[in-house]
Amino acid sequence: GDGRGILFGQIETPQGLRDLHIKGAGKTPYSRFADGRAVLRSTIREYLCGEAMHGLRIPSSRALLMFGSNELVFRETTETGAMLVRTAKTHIRFGHFEYLKHNDKREYIEELLDHVLAEYFPDLVDREDKYEIFFEKTVQSTAELIANWQAVGFAHGVMNTDNMSPVSYTHLRAHETQRYL
């Protein structure tokens, strides 16, 4: 992604563990050239679209809270800064696996995959074919998620590995919410 997100913990809910993730808090080691900030305008849009997905019964991250800041953020114009605290089953993305592969840290790929299986696919953990079945389930659930988007006229603006989760839920970034049809 653009390095604006910080995963800062998990909470126990009636639906199980949920990640707490803040977006727009500032620079992270992954911010690259960006400032790590979010602006109020796009944060409001992301909040509304994520809640719309939830209301339409399409798996989505949820906004726990959103707040503006006194800090000005420079984009095309000067804008009010903002932060969004999101919850989701996980913030693990396909991109995490991709990052490990491209940075020659392949020894961690199986460890991350085993973590995903233990947390979100425990019925597969002891199977010899666990990785193949996981792949099949992920392809199927991702296809169903995208079909649900299409059924309500949503077109995801950036279908890349940063925005796709192995547990198949809608992960929005503010600039992608403009593509609601």
Place the predicted regions along the sequence by residue.
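Conserved ATP-binding subdomain of kinase catalytic cores across diverse folds
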Residues: 1-123
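Phosphate/ATP-binding catalytic cores across multiple sugar-kinase/actin-like superfamilies
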Residues: 138-149
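Glycine-centered, phosphate/nucleic-acid-interacting loop/turn motifs that mediate DNA/RNA or nucleotide
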Residues: 153
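Catalytic-loop of the protein kinase fold
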Residues: 156
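Catalytic-loop Lys-Pro-X-Asn motif of eukaryotic-like protein kinases
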Residues: 161
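Conserved small/polar residues in nucleotide/adenosyl-binding loops
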Residues: 170-178
